[in-house]
A protein has these predicted regions:
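Alpha-helical bundle regulatory/interaction domains
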Residues: 1-133, 137-139, 143-149, 162-163
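Residues within the DNA-recognition helix of helix-turn-helix
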Residues: 155
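Terminal helix-turn-helix DNA-binding modules in bacterial transcription factors
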Residues: 159-163, 167-178
Length: 178
C-alpha cells in the first residue's frame, strides 16, 4: 500500500503490546504486506488517501523485491525519490475526490507502465489462494505450476513479500474475518 497523508502532522505507528510510539510517518509512505496487525490511529480530522494494490500485485510498483518491505512501513522518498512528494502536492491542490483518484491513476500508469509485468505462475497462485483459501493445498498447487517448491517459494516471496504458506494463512484469516 501507499499512504498519502494530506496533513503535515506526523502519524505514528504504535507497538501493539505497549502502545508506545515506535515510528513516525509523514506525508507519503509505503507499507508492505503484513503478517501481523499494525496500530495506527485515525483521528476524526484525518485526511488520507490509501492506494491498495490487488492482492500480490504491488511488486511492479516497487524498485526492490517485496520481501524487503514485508511487515514494514517506509518513507516514500526512500523508495521512489521525490516523485510521490510531487504527487502529494498535486493532490493537495484539489478537494475533488474523483479528480484525486484520476490524478493518482494517471501518475501510476505514467510512472510504472513499463514495469507492470506479473509472473503468470505467481498470479495463478494468488488467484487460487484468494478465491478458495480453505480448499487449497500448496503442494498440489506447486505440482500444477511445475516449479520446485523452493524455486516457486522464492519467486512468490520476491513478488508478494511473503512465502506462499504465509500468504495462504493471511487469506484464510481474511476469509474468517469476513
Amino acid at each position: 500500500e501507499i499512504l498519502i497523508d494530506f496533513h503535515d502532522t506526523p502519524q505514528f505507528i504504535y507497538d501493539n503490546s505497549s502502545l508506545k510510539e515506535i515510528q513516525a510517518c509523514q506525508h507519503v509512505w509505503a507499507s508492505g504486506l503484513r503478517t501481523e496487525p499494525i496500530t495506527i490511529p485515525a483521528g476524526n480530522k484525518s485526511e488520507m488517501m490509501v492506494i491498495s494494490f490487488k492482492k500480490g500485485m504491488a511488486a511492479s510498483f516497487f524498485p526492490f523485491p517485496m520481501e524487503e518491505i514485508a511487515d514494514s512501513v517506509v518513507d516514500a522518498d526512500l523508495v521512489w525519490g521525490t516523485d510521490f512528494g510531487e504527487l502529494r502536492e498535486r493532490l493537495l491542490g484539489t478537494k475533488d475526490i474523483d479528480l484525486r483518484f484520476r490524478i493518482v491513476e494517471e501518475f501510476l500508469i505514467k510512472e510504472f507502465r513499463s514495469q507492470m509485468a506479473v509472473n503468470p505462475c505467481v498470479a495463478f497462485a494468488i488467484s487460487e489462494m484468494t478465491e478458495r483459501p480453505d480448499a487449497l493445498n500448496i503442494a498440489r498447487m506447486n505440482e500444477r505450476i511445475g516449479y520446485s517448491k523452493k524455486h516457486f517459494a522464492e519467486m512468490f516471496r520476491r513478488q508478494v513479500g511473503v512465502t506462499p504458506k504465509s500468504y495462504l494463512k493471511i487469506m484464510r484469516f481474511q476469509k474468517a474475518v469476513k
